[in-house]
Design a protein with these regions (language model features):
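Residue at a conserved register position within TPR or TPR-like alpha-solenoid repeats
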Residues: 30, 64, 84, 97-100
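Conserved structural position within tetratricopeptide repeats
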Residues: 11-14, 44-48, 82
Length: 103
């Protein structure tokens, strides 16, 4: 993880508050570092601004699961399934359904 990259992405997010892309990039950097609370907060912020196709919902579910917040994680995966189907990504939806089935 690069603190410089995190700082740059934060600056980009502040400069363009309606653009969700820097927030997604920031969440990925936090994910690489295992900073799960930051991942959750940043992805929730991203999801308020973006019509996500499922990927962010799955990442949110995984981060919440790392934190032991299983009910919230399962809800995120369910929303990921809905988003993936809505955007024509049945394989992604199936992967999330498999995660839910294995709980």
């Amino acid at each position: 993880m690069s603190e410089e990259r995190i700082a740059a992405l934060r600056k980009m997010a502040e400069a363009k508050p309606d653009d969700p892309r820097p927030r997604f990039g920031l969440a990925l950097e936090f994910e690489k570092a295992g900073r799960w609370d930051d991942v959750v907060q940043t992805l929730r912020d991203y999801l308020q601004r973006a019509d996500d196709e499922g990927n962010a919902w799955g990442r949110l579910g995984a981060a919440l699961r790392h934190l032991g917040r299983d009910d919230e994680a399962q809800e995120a995966y369910r929303k990921g399934v809905e988003a993936a189907y809505r955007h024509g990504h049945p394989t992604m939806a199936g992967e999330f359904e498999d995660v839910l089935d294995s709980w």
